[in-house]
């Protein structure tokens, strides 16, 4: 299933909205950094949601649906949809970066997050107000923040796999330890495996136990 989580912020003025926006942006950055993904924050089209500021978080992947224009000499990055070029997006590779620094590199990305500064667009229509220090109601300045949880997992797999399967990033690995009991018919082996399992469990970790008669390297690969 596609799992997408949304959050909203409500502030009394534009400065507060901008601060909330930056706080949420930092939280997203921290999340993707902890997972260890290769990602970019890009300028984006606000679309039907609207707002003056809109940015997307994209995991770099050849299978991505979106085309991203990234400067090779600065932090500039944007979804090609917002670039004012007459050229076809596929022809933008090597063109001068809009910020005047370096040239554009075109990459594909998987969108896993989208954040907006909405201003008072919705609060005015829905009468969502906040009282100031004098008790006067002010239409709140809103921010909107979405993150695709299931897409993060899919993108992480896209960036971390080999011909034998998934190489889970530590931060989102289902388990950090797996006890493999080779030749469990031997009582001393089984006893030792159960002892190791209990030690790890007592330390507060979830740990699966695999009982197998395969050779060690075959079991680890599996």
Q: Can you say where each PLM-predicted feature lies in the sequence?
A:
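Single conserved hydrophobic/aromatic residue that forms the stacking wall/gate
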Residues: 213-222
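Conserved BB-loop
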Residues: 204-214
């Amino acid at each position: 299933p596609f799992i997408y989580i949304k959050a909203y912020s409500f502030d009394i003025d534009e400065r507060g909205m901008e601060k909330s926006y930056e706080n949420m942006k930092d939280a997203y950055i921290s999340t993707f950094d902890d997972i260890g993904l290769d990602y970019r924050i890009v300028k984006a089209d606000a679309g039907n949601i609207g707002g003056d500021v809109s940015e997307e978080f994209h995991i770099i992947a050849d299978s991505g649906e979106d085309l991203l224009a990234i400067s090779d000499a600065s932090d500039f990055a944007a979804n090609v949809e917002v670039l004012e070029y007459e050229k076809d997006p596929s022809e933008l590779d090597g063109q001068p970066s809009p910020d005047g620094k370096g040239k554009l590199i075109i990459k594909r990305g998987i969108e896993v997050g989208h954040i907006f500064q909405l201003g008072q667009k919705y609060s005015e229509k829905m009468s969502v107000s906040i009282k100031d220090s004098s008790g006067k109601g002010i239409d709140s300045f809103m921010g909107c923040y979405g993150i695709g949880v299931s897409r993060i997992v899919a993108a992480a797999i896209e960036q971390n796999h080999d011909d034998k399967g998934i190489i889970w990033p530590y931060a989102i690995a289902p388990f950090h330890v797996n006890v493999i009991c080779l030749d469990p018919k031997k009582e001393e082996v089984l006893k030792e495996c159960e002892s190791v399992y209990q030690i790890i469990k007592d330390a507060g970790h979830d740990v699966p136990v695999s009982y197998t008669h395969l050779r060690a390297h075959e079991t680890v690969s599996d």
